[in-house]
Amino acid sequence: MIEEEIQCPKGQEDTTMKLNTQYAVDQTMRLLSIDSPTGYTRNVTDELLSILREMGFSPVRTRKGAVACTLGGKGHPLALAAHVDTLGLMVRQIKANGRLAFTRLGGPSFNAVETENVTVITRDGKRYTGVVALRNASSHVNRELDSEKRDDSTLEVLLDEVVSSKEDVEKLGISVGDIICLDPRARVTPSGFIRSRFLDDKLSAGMLLALAKGVADGSVKPARKITIFFSVYEEVGHGASSGLPEDTEDLLVVDMGCVGDEITCTEQQVSICAKDSGGPYDYSMTSELIALAKEHAIDYAVDVYPAYGSDAATALRSGRDIRYALIGAGVYASHGYERSHVKGVENSLRLIEAYAEKE
């Protein structure tokens, strides 16, 4: 459910920009309204195809389900990649008492999913609401409530249906393997903060749509051939293993920037990643991004991410001979209820714009 969608706060958007921050935020909210946990992304890619076709482009969906769209330009092909698959859950077992055991899709924090509203989607498209709860979750009954470990053996989904047995649940059409979607609770505050699950990475997807719009309306002039790529299995480690154009020379992954202890970046900045769990990013390409940020007075930070992987590593492991770099708006509380800011979007768009037009 999208709780609130408001305009970017006045005075916080750079009016000299060619790319539209408000449009990027609007498209982010649009994408957040569509459930798309890993393995259940058809609806969100249908939306991407529709948006891009309305702009006059000819996007394609790969067999694996990703969306690729060439925006124009000539020579030295550059791909910009974001992912539209999100974290989620899947029915692992229907318990004898009518509650659901689950397995995680990707790596949502167990602590962060407790008490979250969910929607269970059956194979035939029925939707049932529910909530993630700890077994024996009443504090007036369970004296060990605060100390009990949260994991997939102690957390369960309670359906908003009158059920008390496995048979009751099966009569609803719910089966093992059904998708369980977490409520994103997306909103933009009057002070410019963007709060939602799955800003990783629908915030970046919104920014790539803003780039496409900038090219479509002629405000951005690509200095080279540019393709935008939306992967759908990033959260489980094989998003960009296929589907990137064969002629790609450089890959700029646009994914969430880390915010936290021992990290320089804030939610208002664009983060440039020097190294993550898989090793350093391409030195020359990363240096180009840093130089552009300085040249254009973009508010940026360079950081090392201690527990992070991206579609760049996936593409490299598939054997691609490419340069690769990673940028993104600063996002706090990753894989939980995340927070960023419109200034982080703005600074990211300014860097994307500068790199797209770089000779």
Which residue ranges define each predicted feature?
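N-terminal hydrophobic/helix-forming segments and targeting peptides
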Residues: M1-E359
